[in-house]
Amino acid sequence: MIDVNKFESMQIGLASPEKIRSWSYGEVKKPETINYRTLKPEREGLFCERIFGPTKDWECACGKYKRIRYKGIVCDRCGVEVTRSKVRRERMGHIELAAPVSHIWYFKGIPSRMGLVLDMSPRALEEVIYFASYVVIEPGDTTLEKKQLLTEREYREKREQYGQAFKAAMGAEAVKQLLDNVDLDGEVAQLKEELKTASGQKRTRAIRRLDILEAFRASGNQPSWMVMDVIPVIPPDLRPMVQLEGGRFATSDLNDLYRRVINRNNRLKRLLDLNAPSIIVQNEKRMLQEAVDALIDNGRRGRPVTGPGNRPLKSLSHMLKGKQGRFRQNLLGKRVDYSGRSVIVVGPFLKMYQCGLPKEMAIELFKPFVMRELVQREIATNIKNAKRKIERGEDEVWDILEEVIQEHPVLLNRAPTLHRLGIQAFEPVLVEGRAIRLHPLVCEAYNADFDGDQMAVHVPLNEEAQAEARMLMLAAQNILNPKDGKPVVTPSQDMVLGNYYLTMEEEGREGEGMIFRDMNEAVLAWQNGYVHLHSRIGVQTTLLGDKPFTDWQKERILITTVGKIIFNEIMPVEFPYLNEPTDYNLTVQTPDKYFVEAGTDIPAHIKEQELVLPFKKKNLGNIIAEVFKRFHITETSKMLDRMKDLGYKHSTYAGMTVGIADIMVLHEKQAIIDAAHKQVETITKQFRRGLITDDERYERVIGVWNGAKDEIQQKLIESMEARNPIFMMSDSGARGNISNFTQLAGMRGLMAAPNGRIMELPIISNFREGLSVLEMFISTHGARKGMTDTALKTADSGYLTRRLVDVAQDVIIREDDCGTDRGLEIEAIREGNEIIEPLDERLLGRYTRKSVVHPETGAIIIGADQLITEDLAREIVDAGIEKVTIRSVFTCNTKHGVCKHCYGRNLATGSDVEVGEAVGTIAAQSIGEPGTQLTMRTFHTGGVAGDDITQGLPRIQEIFEARNPKGQAVITEVTGEVIDISEDPATRQKEVTIKGKTDTRTYTVPYTARMKVAEGDIIHRGAPLTEGSIDPKQLLQVRDVLSVENYLLREVQRVYRMQGVEIGDKHIEVMVRQMLRKIRVMDPGDTEILPGTLMDIAEFKDRNYDTLVAGGVPATSRPVLLGITKASLETNSFLSAASFQETTRVLTDAAIRGKKDPLLGLKENVIIGKIIPAGTGMARYRNMEPKEVGVASENVYSISDIEAQMAAEDAMKNINK
């Protein structure tokens, strides 16, 4: 038995008429669908049961044979085979055409495939196919030329002149004869000769024709198959007809299109039988051609065929195209069973790995499991009975449900799923009500809030799926963000506020200076009101649990607060006692300044000490990162839960409220504003006198008001009260920031007009005073623009992610080490003097290419090919090293993917990346997901030229699509010295002259451009002469691939870092490498490749290797930079490309070439329903055989042995630390 699910690759080709007939189960001769009286399919019609199979299982049309026992019998009365009705989804029919018809895809696409094969223009072809002109097929011994077009009149004249000496015809039959006459081998040989001498337009055309003729020759497709004698009819259940109430029918558009084809075909047959005049027959043939065109691709030529209400009918091509087409709707995005959705509400009582599932949803989702248990425990007699019990909701059902859902994780997903953290696994806990309960800490990963968001639940059914959900997707596992390796589950809002309030210090509150013997005593005193949470007190260190104090500290008394004692209880025991929010305290030890000798006057000592700042959101994040680094997943998730509970508890105790009295009045405000008005007046006077231009006046006015706003903000910060609830909220990072506060208590400042220009009229009032009508009106512009921007940005960002995923979906970690000897030299990314991305962040989690040596001592810090950890990265930077050569995705030699060493650490887990990790998809999500945070607009600074550099999302799109950038910089093509920069006021241009070793070049740059070089500078080729963005395609011509890759990486990082978004370099490297994986062949040498062909670097190297081994001359090529859309469409997989964009074009091309899809990427395998070749679906993991272990093998430990061993190892590690 062949396993239909096991195949290596998938091929597409043109179908010959014989092939179409062999698929068919019978010819459809009548346009009828079903009989409206009996509602049975008509014989020989579009739904005929003889052709397509029975409409009811195991029952023929006339009802003579019913039941399964007649399986396989063909009824002698109605001719219907007795079988399952689902064969109506797979059996095809056909229509024998009375005249050949051209296939619109091959005639109409750009370039016209038929036109290239016949060397005719598409216009000429159209005239022939649609019966406007005759074409000469055999000129005989006349003066006519082959393939010459003749009008009706010319044809008649020539017939009179030459009689039957020549053959000419019109319509698709003529084209078919011409295609049959094409001698592929001869044409190919002739074109190859032509190529040797041809140039320009002629050469391009020759290469194009050669390409297509070679394709036909190699694939075994006949060119004449582009014209069809017979049309397949797709199975009826794929174009259903359903009865609506009221006796009307709804039908698929395809049935209408097929009906028109059959009607016209039958009419044509009748006309031919009657020997009708040729003009009538021609007209009918043309109509048949148009009907078939509409069936295959309605609207491609002329006006589309419309149905009721002037709606164009959906043809076969439309069934595949677009978001609603077969590819994206049914193959890449399927609906799944065992799923539900509901509104989410917060579940603060949950553990990190739990979610609350409403009971009625759970019983529906886990129905089969519960039913099985009911039958197995003999509570129910059979499955039917068990189902009834569940539907009635009997008591024993709920007990069993509780047991069934234990240890059975479910997946929660929130749309839009922008990155892999948008789907996580949780263990369900049954809850009352109808809402799903979500753990508050995972909200950030999902970007969820509880204002009515909904989430979907999915149940992993089989053992493997459950194991994967538990091991890889459990929410407690997903603590780090894959885009930068920082924790994604930092506490927010109330949790931050609670911990902030808990760790505050205040002067002179009750109980200040008291001394306690241990924690419990201090906490008891607080609970009974003797000590305030924020009062500084003394505690004996010896009794503070097992905290790692130094010997010097152990003899002394620690000055801290009750709040901090409580806060430290949730920390791991090995952590230093956290008394101040500093890195030193977190990573080294509690600073000595908080310890005093026993017998000191503690209240007096406390009065001298400054107050310590409380722990803010950022500090909590650092604590979590440190816990993760030292203790890994389990401990971190427990610790997060403790932090969450503590935060909620103490934010409740704190009782933060906001009232109007909390917004204080700033008395200096009026004076500042009056001063600003005076300055503006002075500036206006200067403008009136003509001392400054209008642009300068505008710039200065804006500057004055911004200055006033900043001054007010500064005054507000200075007069801020530390116990002010609004200040506490913004300072802790719980909600809001200082600019919100300025708008409440200071002034709102300047607003943007609808065109993005800043208006000179400031809003002087703040929200406490209230705005005037005019101010209110001005401020609505900005608010509206904000809303529209966000909406547009979301769509743009989503589309960017889709393109990124498509281009990188087949990049998977394929092997351990590719053995490359190349590397990438990296340094900190700078913009002017400002560091955009420091070196240690770029080094972290990468493998070195060469060993790194300390510049002063000469000691080796790290050897070659070793992983750089946090500590090593810091050590390298501290040693003053500025450049390090590392292994990079750019220089990896692995085919169709990356190796472990070139990729380095997996940012999402903090450990080495595993073979099988789908790093391409992760990279695409990491770049696409923050896309919504980037700004939309191109910044236009008021009237200053040369400053319009695109930023934000448009710039990212510009880079990844490899477009010519706006505000392009001029680059030099030679390495040398700038010898002259001259200005020509007449032409308003500057000329820059560079003297290289061999030649001297002069570049003209616009007068307004800001120069980046000065006379006497030594510059390298590819260096920019002016400010602006470099065109990467130009850079590629001047420099090598690695320089371009490096430039693109720096540019992308710049955009994201300017917006405060951190992304790991390796994600951008993966994407950029995909843009540069193709080459264009310049000279084919002795290979079979055509000049100008685009191909994969790996494939090109293989072909050249074979040629060299055979003793031939290898081909030469040059690298090509493709934008991500273009790169996706150029992939080797036609399934992946067709499901991305331009479906018909991709399929047309693939069919002619008889392309084989090797099914290497993820998308292709999802489409055909195979398990994806990444992660556990990789061959090396699927084909593992269980090894037989001897009965009493010495290598088999019991679980308890292993646990004891691990505990001992951990203890050793801690001692070594």
Swiss-Prot record:
Cofactor: Mg(2+); Zn(2+)
Top-rank lineage group of the source organism: Bacteria
Subunit structure and binding partners: The RNAP catalytic core consists of 2 alpha, 1 beta, 1 beta' and 1 omega subunit. When a sigma factor is associated with the core the holoenzyme is formed, which can initiate transcription.
Similarity comment: family membership: Belongs to the RNA polymerase beta' chain family.
Catalysed reaction equations from the record: RNA(n) + a ribonucleoside 5'-triphosphate = RNA(n+1) + diphosphate
Xref: NCBIfam families: rpoC_TIGR
Protein name per its UniProtKB record: DNA-directed RNA polymerase subunit beta'
Bound cofactor: record note: Binds 1 Mg(2+) ion per subunit.
GO biological process: DNA-templated transcription
Organism lineage: Bacteria, Bacillati, Bacillota, Bacilli, Lactobacillales
Binding site for Zn(2+) 1: C60, C62, C75, C78
Record-listed Zn(2+) 2 binding positions: C818, C892, C899, C902
Coiled-coil segments: none
Keyword terms, alphabetized: DNA-directed RNA polymerase, Magnesium, Metal-binding, Nucleotidyltransferase, Transcription, Transferase, Zinc
Record carries keyword Disulfide bond: no
EC number of this enzyme: 2.7.7.6
Keyword Transferase set for record: yes
A GO CC annotation given for this chain: DNA-directed RNA polymerase complex
Alphabetical list of SMART domains matching this protein: RPOLA_N (SM00663)
Molecular function in Gene Ontology: DNA binding; DNA-directed RNA polymerase activity; magnesium ion binding; zinc ion binding
PANTHER family named among the record's database cross-references: DNA-DIRECTED RNA POLYMERASE, DNA-DIRECTED RNA POLYMERASE SUBUNIT BETA
Main function: DNA-dependent RNA polymerase catalyzes the transcription of DNA into RNA using the four ribonucleoside triphosphates as substrates.
Residues at which Mg(2+) binds: D449, D451, D453
